[in-house]
Amino acid sequence: MAAMDPRNNGNVAPLNERERAENLEVREVVEVQDDQSVVSLMSNDSDLQKKMMKKEEKKNGGWTNAIILLVNQGLATLAFFGVGVNLVLFLTRVMGQGNAEAANNVSKWTGTVYMFSLVGAFLSDSYWGRYLTCTIFQVIFVIGVGLLSFVSWFFLIKPRGCGDGDLECNPPSSLGVAIFYLSVYLVAFGYGGHQPTLATFGADQLDDDKNSKAAFFSYFYFALNVGALFSNTILVYFEDKGLWTEGFLVSLGSAIVALVAFLAPTRQYRYVKPCGNPLPRVAQVFVATARKWSVVRPGDPHELYELEGPESAIKGSRKIFHSTKFLFLDRAAVITENDRNGTRSNAWRLCSVTQVEEAKCVMKLLPIWLCTIIYSVIFTQMASLFVEQGDVMNAYVGKFHIPAASMSVFDIFSVFVSTGIYRHIIFPYVRPTELMRMGIGLIIGIMAMVAAGLTEIQRLKRVVPGQKESELTILWQIPQYVLVGASEVFMYVGQLEFFNGQAPDGLKNLGSSLCMASMALGNYVSSLMVNIVMAITKRGENSPGWIPENLNEGHMDRFYFLIAALAAIDFVVYLIFAKWYQPISHDEDSIKGGSGGSLKKTVSELEQV
């Protein structure tokens, strides 16, 4: 690759081969204390420099810290689902909202949770770093759960024990409603803001071994479901009995313990410095491309500009090899006569190949990411329409009453079983790629929607006139929950690995947040679909719509089948983009920029002699 001398005021003035050979004969011996030995290093020995840096990075970290972060994830998830899993029933029973309104509000809230992940990822990658980002947002999360416990106790649960499905609550005051929404959106901000960063921070604790990091992401999702298991059984049961405040207080305690566990090993964590704001870097590529639109791209990518030596031009990032996608962006790395004539280089006119490839990576990931949104529409039904569907079914098994929200325990058990089957039976022999696993997850998700639609058809057939609940047992919902759980193992764990592994070093948190951003848009799309479907299908009293206040008068089965049909179309589009996708290729012999300046500086100075 063509090189620009970083010590020559940004001028493009490459040395000829003879001068370079003469300069490189000069050696500077650097004495480095390593335990009890003294090692002499040559200033141009990039391999040894890289090993020194990696050894320095690996002093801390390890699986012990990673396990602590998994515990933190489980406890934080317990607290989060203690709020979220029964939120739709809290809105209908305590806040007095209708089914469609409550389902929409839950979808919007859940979408906001995951949309805030982009905020956390940006702050982490650009300014705060992973540790500080996780700390700040977990503190916000604790404040939100605490405020929710307070407003429930003093404003909303009136009289005591109301909201159990039998005893109605008094209409909430305006102040109570305001504090309630403030608290739940603080919960959304705090939990969503730190989730993707926590996943990346956990991966940072491990060495650069793909299998170790793949195992961590599987355990990360496993820990999430362990925390959700307690919330979806014990907490849901008490909240279903009207003990809402007590359930929120348990969530508060879990959130506090999670924060303490996270802070405990602060000195033992392995830290990765933020790489700076990526937005200007990406924008520079497009601006430079536009300014050089008439420039002819060279046939040989080695003629494009790249920083010479092992160090990357982007702080905290390895070099990225040239790719054959979006070749028009290569113009940003073409060295023109204006760049060679001695004028000062302009970052908005000339970009390195690594910087161009960083922008290409973002563009290559977007089509894959967009195809995951419909799956998130499938997933979000579990927290809204699945619960409302179960609430109008026969929830008794003998004399034992099963809360509708507790049916998600079958989703969790399905995740446990599917994770074990995948890690110990499928993976050792087949080892499907992340893209293959995501496609499998989408297919299973379609099957879940079909199962939910068939269950709804049977539920409507067993409705007794004048009764709210159908005679169909709630156990008919088991297949749809099990299928959603199995699909998660393939889709969401695959997404975590794919977006984290394919994101450039300077955008790792953004890569992890794309998974949660997909969930966010999935919830918003679900809410939009409900509104559109109700607007089209509601025709007065004789046609109350597919999802009316009284579900026995609607056709929620058709809504499930609509989602399945859209997901099938999405799967075809996904196959096209998955086949088109070209993986990122890092230069493993390169050094993360901004971290090895001393030795590099010596070589640069010698080259100017």
UniProtKB/Swiss-Prot annotation:
Phosphothreonine: residues bearing it: 133
Ranges annotated as spanning the membrane: 67-87, 109-129, 136-156, 173-193, 216-236, 243-263, 367-387, 402-422, 438-458, 474-494, 516-536, 559-579
InterPro entries documented for this protein: MFS_trans_sf, POT_fam
Membrane-topology descriptor: Multi-pass membrane protein
Keywords tagged on the record: Membrane, Phosphoprotein, Transmembrane, Transmembrane helix, Transport
Tissue expr: Expressed in flowers.
Compartment(s) of residence: Membrane
Source taxon at top rank: Eukaryota
Disulfide bonds: none
Keyword Transport in annotation: yes
This protein's GO CC annotations: plasma membrane
Molecular function via GO: transmembrane transporter activity
Gene3D superfamilies: MFS general substrate transporter like domains
Pfam family, one: PTR2
Family the entry assigns: Belongs to the major facilitator superfamily. Proton-dependent oligopeptide transporter (POT/PTR) (TC 2.A.17) family.
Protein name in the entry: Protein NRT1/ PTR FAMILY 7.1
